[in-house]
């Protein structure tokens, strides 16, 4: 079964890269969307923008700020193994 990765809506390039690698990608529109995700990727523009870092999820949260889509994919892979 594909790992479920939650991402913020503005990260469309990351969404495409993760889907290409076989991940199940869901858009996080509210903190509840992070539940059940194996990993979450946030922009980092507004720290804890959706309350995701407030232990809504036990999954790793990756801040995408300053990273390319490929770097984010590598980080996701290393965090969910």
From Swiss-Prot:
Bridged cysteine pairs (disulfide): none
The record's section on InterPro entries has: UPF0180
Identify the domain of life: Bacteria
Which positions carry the signal peptide feature in this UniProt record?
none
Q: Name one Pfam family in it.
A: UPF0180
The family line of this record is: Belongs to the UPF0180 family.
What protein name applies here? UPF0180 protein YkuS
What gene is this protein translated from?
ykuS
């Amino acid at each position: 079964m594909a790992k479920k990765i939650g991402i913020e809506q503005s990260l469309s390039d990351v969404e495409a890269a993760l889907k290409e690698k076989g991940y199940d990608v869901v858009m996080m529109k509210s903190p509840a969307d992070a539940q059940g995700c194996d990993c979450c990727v946030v922009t980092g523009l507004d720290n804890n923008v959706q309350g995701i870092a407030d232990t809504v999820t036990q999954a790793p949260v990756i801040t995408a700020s300053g990273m390319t889509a490929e770097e984010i994919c590598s980080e996701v892979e290393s965090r969910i193994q």
